[in-house]
Amino acid sequence: MDKIPSFTIDHDRLLRGIYVSRQDFIGNEVVTTFDIRMKEPNREPALHIGALHTIEHLAATYLRNDSEWKERVVYWGPMGCLTGNYLILKGNLNSAEIVDLMRRTFEFVASFEGEIPGAAPKDCGNYLLHDLPMARWESRKFVDEVLNKNTEDNLIYPFREE
């Protein structure tokens, strides 16, 4: 079988950042899938699943309520490898265009207090699997160390040279 494009990224060189994972057409509209990479793959511990689940709930809630972007949000969800999240937006977009949106999103998570939206049995399939303190800590770290200091290396995928 052919190797899928996401397996052609050089994960040995991949940094934390915001990357265009793919762009697809749905009808006449382009949708852009972003890799929101919070951890360096295989070089630092993955995100704790409870923290990642909480980030999912809070980020999805924030994004779907953001006055500028809410109509373009298709999906926000965690990566199976636990090193980040995927964001799918309507439009032909690049990574630099959403840095401010991601900064606002992760600032929201980093400063969130109170009940986690959707963390109730009737709303969530695993409502007990949350860790707000770690979600806040990971989000603050991502803002301070990546989003406030990003360069091209944090915005453009390193592809493997085969």
Language model features with spans:
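Active-site-adjacent, His/Asp/Glu-enriched structural segments that form or flank metal-binding
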Residues: 76-149
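Phenylalanine-focused residue identity feature
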Residues: 7, 25, 34, 106-108, ...
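His/Glu-rich zincin catalytic helix
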Residues: 1-63
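M16/MPP (pitrilysin/insulinase) zinc-metallopeptidase core fold and M16-derived inactive scaffolds
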Residues: 41-97
